[in-house]
């Protein structure tokens, strides 16, 4: 579990909410429903609803799931590691060695998810 923040700057929940909804960044809504974003279209059903996620997972768990979901769930999870260099199959060569999100974006998402109680 990753207890310590990835950056020295505290996460910003408002920025995390934007990343969560942004189809070109976190794109969390593609797989997860979230009642806090009822105004957004097309909530996914692949992953669990994130309503009340802060009541189910501690901060360190949320950070670990975002960094590399396979460290918490099984290797078969379809959730990508957003701050991991571990890649799956059929990844474009120009993307190897790059993370999906930056460390501060992970911290912003953690701050936002911690508000979903």
Annotate each language-model stretch with its function.
Residues 7-8, 40-41, 100:
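Short helix-capping and inter-helix turn/linker motifs at the boundaries of alpha-helical repeat units
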Residues 12, 58, 101-105:
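An acidic site on a long C-lobe helix of protein kinase domains
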């Amino acid at each position: 579990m990753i207890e310590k923040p990835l950056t020295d700057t505290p996460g910003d929940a408002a920025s995390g909410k934007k990343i969560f909804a942004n189809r070109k960044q976190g794109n969390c809504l593609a797989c997860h429903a979230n009642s806090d974003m009822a105004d957004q279209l097309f909530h996914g059903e692949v992953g669990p609803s994130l309503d009340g996620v802060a009541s189910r997972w501690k901060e360190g768990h949320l950070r670990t799931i975002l960094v590399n979901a396979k460290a918490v769930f099984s290797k078969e999870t379809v959730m990508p590691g957003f701050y991991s260099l571990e890649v799956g199959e059929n990844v474009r060569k120009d993307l190897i060695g790059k993370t999906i999100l930056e460390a501060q974006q992970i911290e912003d998402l953690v701050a936002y998810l911690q508000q979903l109680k």
